[in-house]
């Protein structure tokens, strides 16, 4: 496992994580198209967010993130337009350290994320999605 590669998408992903750490929601939103769609399974039920205002509500959840560590288990990209990542995530919560696994897939248009599948693969309680 490791870090994102030194490719255009690798650098874009690193910037995305850095913006999350900085809690810079507006800059994160600037990485998405105006009509972007994000499908999330973080809450064990599908949540669909369309457009910047709904994405803004989704990303408000990052304000509570502390001590985020990302370890990439799988990285696949095609032509600066498609990206699939499996990440081992560790972060601090009020209850202690939470460990989980995500599978993120991005479809990019004009250098911005148009479609984002944000999938929880393993929940903090250890259950597999």
What residue spans do the PLM features occupy?
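A solvent-exposed, acidic/Ser-Thr-rich amphipathic alpha-helical stretch
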Residues: 6, 25-81
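Short solvent-exposed loop/turn micro-motifs enriched in small/polar/acidic residues
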Residues: 11, 67-69, 97-100
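Structural motif
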Residues: 35, 81-82, 105, 112
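Hydrophobic/aromatic beta-strand elements that line small-molecule binding cavities or substrate pockets
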Residues: 70-76, 89, 101-107
